[in-house]
């Protein structure tokens, strides 16, 4: 049995491993319970296990594309692992989902300048940038 209180007790004791075991147990029973999923990624990040946190958050982003918090958590792990291009992409999606399209566009432009991307990654960024610019233009007041 997993409860948020038990997880918090384990985290307060500094036993992130026990907290994660409780969370994973809870997720086997309630696989879509987002508070456990947030807590799992957060505990991995707090323990400095950013590669594992990144793997978890990438799965969550695939499953819950419209959850800005998962994108933010993914961005945090990308920053910790030095993946600048992907960091800016993740932040762009977070900002977009929060309704701040200009900030999302800025992040995609930073991703373009970050370098290190292959042709496919750069094409994805360019396409997303084009879509966001179109959406922003359609929201502008008509004269």
Where are these regions (language model features)?
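Alpha-helical linker/edge segments of TPR/alpha-solenoid repeat scaffolds
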Residues: 50, 80-90, 120, 130-143
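Short, small-residue-biased leader/transition segments that mark boundaries at the very start
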Residues: 1-3
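Canonical positions in the second alpha-helix
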Residues: 26, 59-60, 94, 111
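Helix-start (N-cap) detector for alpha-helical repeat units in TPR-like alpha-solenoids
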Residues: 17, 34-35, 68-69, 85, ...
């Amino acid at each position: 049995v997993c409860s948020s209180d038990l997880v918090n007790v384990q985290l307060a004791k500094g036993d992130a491993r026990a907290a994660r075991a409780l969370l994973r147990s809870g997720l086997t029973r309630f696989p879509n319970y987002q508070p456990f999923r947030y807590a799992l990624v957060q505990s991995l990040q707090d323990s400095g296990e950013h590669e594992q946190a990144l793997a978890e958050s990438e799965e969550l982003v695939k499953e819950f594309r419209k959850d800005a918090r998962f994108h933010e958590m993914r961005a945090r792990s990308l920053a910790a692992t030095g993946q600048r291009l992907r960091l800016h992409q993740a932040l762009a999606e977070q900002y977009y989902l929060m309704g701040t399209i200009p900030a999302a566009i800025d992040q995609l432009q930073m991703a373009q300048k970050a370098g290190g991307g292959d042709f496919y990654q750069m094409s994805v960024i360019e396409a997303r940038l084009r879509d966001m610019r179109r959406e922003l233009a359609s929201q502008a007041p008509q004269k």
